[in-house]
Design a protein with these regions (language model features):
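Exposed extracellular interaction/assembly regions and N-terminal maturation sites
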Residues: 22-93, 108-109, 116-129
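Extracellular beta-sheet repeat scaffolds used for adhesion and glycan interaction
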Residues: 92-101
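A diffuse structural propensity rather than consistent per-protein peaks
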Residues: 6, 14, 40-42
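Short proline/glycine- and polar residue-rich coil/turn motifs
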Residues: 102-107
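Register-specific beta-strand positions within repetitive beta-rich fiber domains
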Residues: 8-27
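Generic signature of intrinsically disordered, low-complexity, basic-rich segments
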Residues: 1, 16, 30-34
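Tryptophan-centered short beta-strand motifs
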Residues: 1-5, 121-123
Length: 129
């Protein structure tokens, strides 16, 4: 994904330059929906996607997934349910040594981190909290 240009005493940083950032923060691009069985996520526009007050089983994260991910791009998905909800990831996601979660637990927050794997063209699960 493309990060927003940063301005400071050294001037602007463009997406094609090589620059070392020291004491700088890169703010994640965040989008959210209150509840959806097929969430709409455009990976060109978000780093973190939040489902809040999830009141439905998630039947597919793949159905409305759009964007052109880059090698090793990171996607963070947050699900906060109103109860235990089933999760179906779909064909755009894969497990690694970390399994894809298949359900939320009550109203607990579920954080799932993915890294785009260009070898398989899938979002590979890298961590679950």
């Amino acid at each position: 994904g493309v990060r927003t240009a940063v301005k400071d005493s050294i001037g602007s940083v463009t997406p094609t330059s090589t620059t070392t950032f020291t004491n700088k923060r890169i703010t994640a691009r965040v989008d959210s929906t209150t509840s959806s069985a097929t969430p709409s996520i455009n990976t060109d526009n978000v780093d973190t996607y939040k489902l809040t007050a999830q009141a439905l089983d998630i039947t597919s994260f793949t159905t409305n997934l759009t964007g052109t991910p880059t090698d090793d791009q990171i996607l963070h998905i947050v699900i906060i349910g109103t109860g235990a909800r089933a999760i179906t990831w779909g064909s755009s996601f894969e497990a690694s040594t970390v399994a894809l979660p298949t359900t939320t637990v009550s109203t607990d927050r579920l954080d799932v981190y993915f890294i785009f794997n260009t070898a398989t063209s899938k979002w590979r699960c890298g961590g679950v909290w």
